[in-house]
Amino acid sequence: MLSAEGISYGTRDREILYEISLRAEAGEFVGIIGPNGSGKSTLLKNLYKVLRPRAGRAFLMGEDLLAMSGREMAQRLAVVVQEHESGFDFTVEEVVRMGRHARKGLLEADNGQDRSLVDRVLRLTQLEEVREQSYTTLSGGEKQRVLIARALVQDTPCLLLDAPTNHLDIKYQLQLMELVRVLGRTVVAAIHDLNLAALYCQRLYVMKAGRVAASGTPEEVLTPELLREIYEVEAEVARDSRGCLRIFFQPIRNEGEESI
């Protein structure tokens, strides 16, 4: 469904990504994890063409992603980014309806099917009560939910999510991840919360310093040894009473340092 082969990217000053390869099969939920600055967001930006790789290729549904027009890509791939400021005073519903633009002609109006889909997604994301409210007045978490709703209304077979649970309360984090999972679409998401990644992702790619350091199922990847190597923390990994993988981090004690 979505794959990258040998993606490398850098600026004049430094190399940021080194020959990154990954694959997400149809209906698979794939997570990209790693510490801050490891290249997760940069990799996604190369996949949705905000940045152009120096080397490598990407494919979506068997076709060259980097050669697709913006409209072709938008009909197959929806993206949710971390930045969500808007200089225009649109209502929540208007922002969500923008997800249908890739399916429309230049002057084509929304039809009953479009309106029904928008209504359904507003309900699923619990945004009905603020649908007429200005997007600019929302909290960071509410804005994030609006952008996720817009991506769902785009109705593409594949989703790219860059830190989708940022700014969200734990309730909405869990609701969002569960909603994305049950939709059955192909998902590639950069995720900071390792317990959420363990709970919802079928496969993980671990990045460090612009390279893929490990990949596999959560059980294969989220080990105390790898967490120590990648994140420089001590952790225990176990299963809870429901059989779900859980990570328990140990406190970091700065022994021998002066008190502040």
Say what each PLM segment does.
Residues 33-35:
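The feature captures the beta-strand-to-loop junction immediately N-terminal to the Walker
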Residues 48:
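Helix-to-loop junction immediately C-terminal to a conserved catalytic motif
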Residues 97, 112-130:
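Conserved ABC ATPase "signature" region
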Residues 109, 134-138, 142:
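Conserved ABC ATPase signature
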Residues 159-163:
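Catalytic Walker B motif of ABC-type/P-loop ATPase nucleotide-binding domains
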